[in-house]
Amino acid sequence: PHIEIEEITEPDLDAQLTADDLALGLERFGPLKFKVLAYRALQRIVKAGALGTEIRLSGKLPSSRARTWRFSQGYLKKTGDSAKVVDRAQARAQTKPGTVGVKVSILRPDAKLKDKIEVNDELIQKLKANSEEKIEIKQPKKNKK
């Protein structure tokens, strides 16, 4: 079999690496430091240039009752055709109270969003030229008495 290996140029923008790193941190430092770990990971992702990110931690984190914690920042598409460009990953952390699920979603800075419209000076000039050509002044009709 032929295997190709590529270097990950920006590890903070890779969802699987971030999820695995977060799961490893939860196993190492315990479930009480989960907020610190999640916010640090969130800041690293945003500092790397992501348009938006979301981290979900599910399980027995601060107590014996299971709960889902959601940390998000920026713009992130969840549904529709544009949601296909979002990088998603899952990981599991085995902590003393129980298993914790880690889900990471990252919208990369180079993602092509179909609903995003960029307006530059050239487009503005074309619109102005088109609007000037089509404007016709109509004289109001005079009523005959």
In which residue ranges do the predicted regions lie?
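RNA-contacting regions in translation and RNA-metabolism proteins
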Residues: P1-K145
